[in-house]
Swiss-Prot record:
Superkingdom of origin: Viruses
InterPro entries: Lambda_DNA-bd_dom_sf, Phage_CI_C, Phage_CI_N
Name of the gene encoding the protein in the UniProt record: CI
Any one GO biological process: protein complex oligomerization
The family this protein is said to belong to: Belongs to the CI repressor protein family.
GO MF term set: DNA binding
Function as written in the Swiss-Prot or TrEMBL entry: Repressor of lysogeny.
Protein name: Repressor protein CI
Keyword tags: DNA-binding, Repressor, Transcription, Transcription regulation
Amino acid sequence: MRIDSLGWSNVDVLDRICEAYGFSQKIQLANHFDIASSSLSNRYTRGAISYDFAAHCALETGANLQWLLTGEGEAFVNNRESSDAKRIEGFTLSEEILKSDKQLSVDAQFFTKPLTDGMAIRSEGKIYFVDKQASLSDGLWLVDIEGAISIRELTKLPGRKLHVAGGKVPFECGIDDIKTLGRVVGVYSEVN
């Protein structure tokens, strides 16, 4: 049997790959595989099946290769995706602006405490895992200071005050003077 006679649609294959990764935009797929958006566009229009992307996706996400290529069967065999992995909203923090990015799938056992309302923030070569439901305590926090988003070290002081460090100049302020967006519960950093 010839592979090209199977009637598979490359557009559908690439769309299922995006779905398995949790990407909502095609540019996220191009960025993930470190290719130009025009190269991805060629894959969509030329009709050649992207077997390499399908294989990488199956290995990275645990997605069922048969489902990726044909659309038949379950997306994740043994329901691995729903039982072990937790989908976390992804964001990029750059120049004090928080932008939506691709979702991350993280093994739920990675966290010692359940992450009920989490987000993953990519900034300066690290990924910060943030719990948006945490109550204010000393530690590393994602904060909004007059519209500028950053990750800062907060220390509670008497009189409903905070010591804020981690920027160019540490300062003290009232608890209500800055907005806390979530507590950093973990940091992932690659070592070169």
